Amino acid sequence: MDENTRLQVLADIEKYERLGEFDRHVDPVDMSMALPVDENYQYIPKGFLKIKRELERKIYVEPFRKKANKNILKTEFRGRENLEGLGGAIITCNHVNKFDCLAVGQAAKGHRVYFIGAPFNNMKGFMGEMMRAGGLLPLSDNMTAMKNLNRAISALLAKGNMVTCYPEQAMWWNYEKPRPFKDGAFSIAVMNKVPIVPMFITFRNSGEFDANGIEIKYMTVNIMKPIYPDVTLSRRENVNRMREENYRMCCEKYEEIYQKKLEYVTGE
């Protein structure tokens, strides 16, 4: 994202917060750069493709993820003890940077982490190859593909992997506040009888500024205690309870880190 685009994105974020439209995409999307996600898409690759992806992950993705968090993003991690002893789980996180998947993946190091993403993330070229090797599970408007995705998620969770879902839906660059959550992540957790692992990214000032005077921010990934489904509740009750609890935890973490009350500027 160049400096001029950043200014427009920040203006759009301010506009949509005032309108209460927290799930609007504000970053330019170029679908011409995306590969189709149809009924033939291999969410869990087999044969040669499996070997290729594993090699790409070990040779390129994991070393880059480690170096990027340490040297570029300067990410800090708090609460890793909350991941101890966990197997399959759904990670939720606020979506505030194109590369926050690198921070989430590093936060859960020691676990294999996959990422549910919008179809436009299934990119052509080297970047797309690295995203797929890094665990991208793209959504689709193809019903058969979506059924395949749901089956793949269940299989991955059953094997003890973690799957990341961004319940706010859209990426809002450097946005500090938690936004209202969609049901998807919590429905998946309830259906598969696995916990939610809430993560919430907060920002630290760097003291450095870009060409437009916008301060460069460093991320801290706050890993909170898992939220488990309640076997005594119905599916809908569980989804609502887990979603509301996750959102409450993020709101409390926001107020703890920034030392101010969470308030949205809306209706003006």
Model regions: which residues?
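Short, basic, glycine/proline-bearing loop/turn elements
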Residues: F64-R65, A133-S140, E168-M171
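Non-catalytic C-terminal accessory region of glycerolipid acyltransferases
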Residues: M1-L35, N150-E268
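Membrane-anchoring hydrophobic helices of lipid-metabolizing enzymes
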Residues: M1-I90, F99-A103, G128, A133
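Catalytic core of membrane glycerolipid acyltransferases/transacylases, capturing the structured
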Residues: G85-M143
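Short, glycine/polar-rich helix-capping loops at beta-to-alpha or helix-loop-helix junctions
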Residues: K52, N122-M127, G207, I216
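A conditional alpha-helix N-cap/helix-loop micro-motif detector
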Residues: L73, N142-K147, P178-R179
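Short, charge-rich binding segments
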Residues: N82-E84, Q106-A107, S154-A158
